[in-house]
Amino acid sequence: MHSFARHRHSPAGKESAKETKGLILNGGWRYDLMGWFHDTFSFRGQWRELRKRTADLARIQPGEQVLDVGCGTGTLAIEVQQRVGRAGRVAGIDPGTRQIAHARSKAARRNLPIDFQTGVIEQIPFPDQTFDVVLSTLMMHHLPAGLKRQGLAEIARVLKPGGRLVIADFKRKQERQGRAARFHAGGSSMQDLMALVKDAGFSEMETEEMQPARFSAFPGAGFVRAYKN
């Protein structure tokens, strides 16, 4: 069974407080409810499609090391483990302790060696240049701009040179937000997100959109793919 080295990182050289916050993240019951909603109803298939498209855009290869930031109950990480195979390694971090417990249980039932840890994007608990790929789905909108900057800097730190980052998030200012989006902070501006990704040391950025299906609670999403310089 593969394992990752643990790392306690603070830019100032000291242990910093975990700061990730938001309506879902601060309200444990809301966070657990959304995890259950995603896994049970799958936005009428669109959450499943979003996971697949995220992994496809990342161009994940057998044997690679992949981190899922904001992994929730581990559904995407489990699917990614199947892509990297036993020679690869997958880790997931999430601020929700119940989410991580559920993710570990799901992986254990499938006998998958995924390293799920409670953690936040602004303090990723892994050494520099550990991962080939970092994924983030439907979590950036929880964060104010300052935490996005910190988190993207941390992602750049743990990615290997040339590593790939794929972010998928609800889009901002949808004409039909849908019930699911009301649990969140209004979605993300893809232009603003791309600027932050570039400032964090990424290049070759590409974007893609996923439109909502008719009568679906899913509000539509945007994807950003970029490579670490």
What is the predicted role of each segment?
Residues E122-V133:
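A short acidic, Gly/Pro-enriched loop at the edge of an enzyme's catalytic core
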